[in-house]
């Protein structure tokens, strides 16, 4: 999976198409990511001892990694991710600009 926690991404398909945000959590086993402010869902919760109020809570649900693209750090446009070896270490590279990603 080429997307990591902390990456800036844009949603390319689905109901939130065009929205951008930062990856809060990456779930590589499920091929999903949680993006800040994207795919907001409501959950109805019964009152419990921990949460005596109960009610409806909103939170970000996971979105499939194929539905997001990394934003190029140089041009701020969607780009694919490649890898190259620099100083004996593998680094991620933006395909459009060749810029190294963190």
UniProtKB/Swiss-Prot annotation:
Q: Tell me where the transmembrane regions lie.
A: none
On subunit structure and binding partners, the annotation says: Part of the 50S ribosomal subunit.
Please name the GO terms of the biological process aspect recorded for this protein, alphabetically: translation
- Which HAMAP family does this one have? Ribosomal_uL24_B
Coiled coil feature spans: none
A GO term for molecular function: rRNA binding
Any one Pfam family match given in the protein's UniProt record, by short name: KOW
Q: What is this protein called?
A: Large ribosomal subunit protein uL24
Q: What does this protein do?
A: One of two assembly initiator proteins, it binds directly to the 5'-end of the 23S rRNA, where it nucleates assembly of the 50S subunit.
- In its UniProt entry, the species of origin is given as Macrococcus caseolyticus (strain JCSC5402) (Macrococcoides caseolyticum)
**UniProt keyword annotation of Protein transport present:** no
């Amino acid at each position: 999976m080429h997307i990591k926690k902390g990456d800036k991404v844009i949603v390319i398909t689905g109901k939130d198409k065009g929205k951008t945000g930062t990856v809060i959590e990456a779930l590589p086993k499920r091929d999903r990511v949680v993006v800040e402010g994207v795919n907001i869902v409501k959950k109805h919760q019964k009152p419990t001892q921990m949460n005596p109020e109960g009610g409806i809570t909103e939170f970000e649900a996971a979105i499939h990694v194929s539905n997001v693209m990394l934003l190029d750090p140089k041009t701020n446009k969607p780009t694919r991710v490649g890898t190259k070896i620099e100083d004996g270490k593998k680094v991620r590279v933006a395909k459009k600009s060749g810029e190294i990603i963190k």
